[in-house]
Amino acid sequence: MDISNLPPHIRQQILGLISKPQQNNDESSSSNNKNNLINNEKVSNVLIDLTSNLKIENFKIFNKESLNQLEKKGYLIIDNFLNDLNKINLIYDESYNQFKENKLIEAGMNKGTDKWKDKSIRGDYIQWIHRDSNSRIQDKDLSSTIRNINYLLDKLDLIKNEFDNVIPNFNSIKTQTQLAVYLNGGRYIKHRDSFYSSESLTISRRITMIYYVNKDWKKGDGGELRLYTNNPNNTNQKELKQTEEFIDIEPIADRLLIFLSPFLEHEVLQCNFEPRIAITTWIY
């Protein structure tokens, strides 16, 4: 059946019906199979507990109020995360240079013979940044060209460490990092970063951290991240609201957005400027 001429939203639904769930992998998108990309009606029955029996003496970055917001609202925004203009500029330059040197690849969904691409669904270019257990970038050639990005990743590791040190039984498994560049006209349709269940506790993304480095971004440039705020993790919310509530988060430089990977749907609105640069680290 040829569905190439159908509207994008119809193609999405058809692809969702004929696809089979698959586990996350480094070559796929943040929604790693067609089913996860399309079928956004799934709701997990496993909650992410970020506020019980906290070891408050280990707080360095967060406090009880911020963790409560992350658990109940599902997201947290930290502006001026690095608060270092020189570092921000260097991270921007390193990121864009990776793109200009053709180190990024066009993003797609799924992998192998099942991999598919459609810029009307997802239009970014990506590069995976792999670090070892000692927080060293595994690719030595890459390491020498993104020293300031690695500095940022060290700072994001401190957040992961604080989750482990403050929240009993958080027990992070690993992190995964991706550099993404969108050009003018690029977008990414509504999706979740993972689906959380008792059978996949060790393979699911739990926390998404997105760092933006878009200098001189202004209203009208597009590329906002539309975050849908119906949060199934909120135990006080007896049932999800039928109306879709959302906030549009501006991708301004030195802004860090943190949200619950399995629960909050989101999309990248069409970019009217380029490059739109985001560095995402997921905590498993």
Curated annotation (Swiss-Prot):
GO biological process, one term: SCF complex assembly
Record comment: activity regulation: Inhibited by the prolyl-hydroxylase inhibitors alpha,alpha'-dipyridyl and ethyl 3,4-dihydroxybenzoate.
Protein residues bound to Fe cation: 191, 193, 266
Gene3D superfamilies linked to this entry: q2cbj1_9rhob like domain (2.60.120.620)
A GO cellular component entry from the record: cytoplasm
General function of this protein: Catalyzes the post-translational formation of 4-hydroxyproline.
Amino acids binding 2-oxoglutarate: 276
Main location per the UniProt record: cytoplasm
Family in the record: Belongs to the P4HA family.
Catalysis: reaction(s): L-prolyl-[Skp1 protein] + 2-oxoglutarate + O2 = trans-4-hydroxy-L-prolyl-[Skp1 protein] + succinate + CO2
An example molecular function term from Gene Ontology annotations: peptidyl-proline dioxygenase activity
Protein name: Prolyl 4-hydroxylase subunit alpha
Localization in the cell: Cytoplasm
Keywords: Cytoplasm, Dioxygenase, Iron, Metal-binding, Oxidoreductase, Vitamin C
UniProt xrefs under SMART domains: P4Hc
Organism from which the protein derives: Dictyostelium discoideum
Cofactors, names only: Fe(2+); L-ascorbate
Details of cofactor binding: Binds 1 Fe(2+) ion per subunit.
Residue span(s) of domain Fe2OG dioxygenase: 169-284
EC number: 1.14.11.-
One Pfam entry name: 2OG-FeII_Oxy_3
Primary enzyme class: oxidoreductase
Quaternary structure and interacting proteins, as annotated: Heterotetramer of two alpha-1 chains and two beta chains (the beta chain is the multi-functional PDI).
